[in-house]
From Swiss-Prot:
<keyword id="KW-0687">Ribonucleoprotein</keyword>
<keyword id="KW-0820">tRNA-binding</keyword>
<dbReference type="GO" id="GO:0022625">
    <property type="term" value="C:cytosolic large ribosomal subunit"/>
</dbReference>
<feature type="compositionally biased region" description="Basic residues">
    <location>
        <begin position="1"/>
        <end position="17"/>
    </location>
</feature>
<dbReference type="InterPro" id="IPR000114">
    <property type="entry name" value="Ribosomal_uL16_bact-type"/>
</dbReference>
<keyword id="KW-0689">Ribosomal protein</keyword>
<comment type="similarity">
    <text>Belongs to the universal ribosomal protein uL16 family.</text>
</comment>
<dbReference type="GO" id="GO:0019843">
    <property type="term" value="F:rRNA binding"/>
</dbReference>
<dbReference type="InterPro" id="IPR047873">
    <property type="entry name" value="Ribosomal_uL16"/>
</dbReference>
<dbReference type="GO" id="GO:0003735">
    <property type="term" value="F:structural constituent of ribosome"/>
</dbReference>
<dbReference type="InterPro" id="IPR016180">
    <property type="entry name" value="Ribosomal_uL16_dom"/>
</dbReference>
<comment type="subunit">
    <text>Part of the 50S ribosomal subunit.</text>
</comment>
<keyword id="KW-0694">RNA-binding</keyword>
<protein>
    <recommendedName>
        <fullName>Large ribosomal subunit protein uL16</fullName>
    </recommendedName>
</protein>
<dbReference type="InterPro" id="IPR036920">
    <property type="entry name" value="Ribosomal_uL16_sf"/>
</dbReference>
<dbReference type="Pfam" id="PF00252">
    <property type="entry name" value="Ribosomal_L16"/>
</dbReference>
<dbReference type="GO" id="GO:0000049">
    <property type="term" value="F:tRNA binding"/>
</dbReference>
Amino acid sequence: MLIPRKVKHRKQHHPRQRGIASGGTTVNFGDYGIQALEHAYVTNRQIESARIAINRHIKRGGKVWINIFPDRPLTKKPAETRMGSGKGSPEWWVANVKPGRVLFELSYPNEGVARAALTRAIHKLPIKARIITREEQF
């Protein structure tokens, strides 16, 4: 699982999800990529699940890059707890994804297999996304 080693503050505010991604919108390392088309919080478990789906499909022939990192804690209060008494404890870590952001990159010699692997990964993510190549822009 992807989690930060050390953070300055254990709990954070939740910002509104607005705007489009200003950086990380092109494929830099691989040949193909998954690009987000909407706002979302992607959890560390969803990132790991998508990575496993890609690796199982391509087996040993290619290389995968993960371009997002879950650096924001989301908190939750325990079940059957009365209101008040402060903010809940951190439950999971999420990455704040904006439209246009490239989430995963893949380098693989066969385009058909690469697209099939990335399609499987998209099904594991909670957002609408598309597959792009190195030449495409947002």
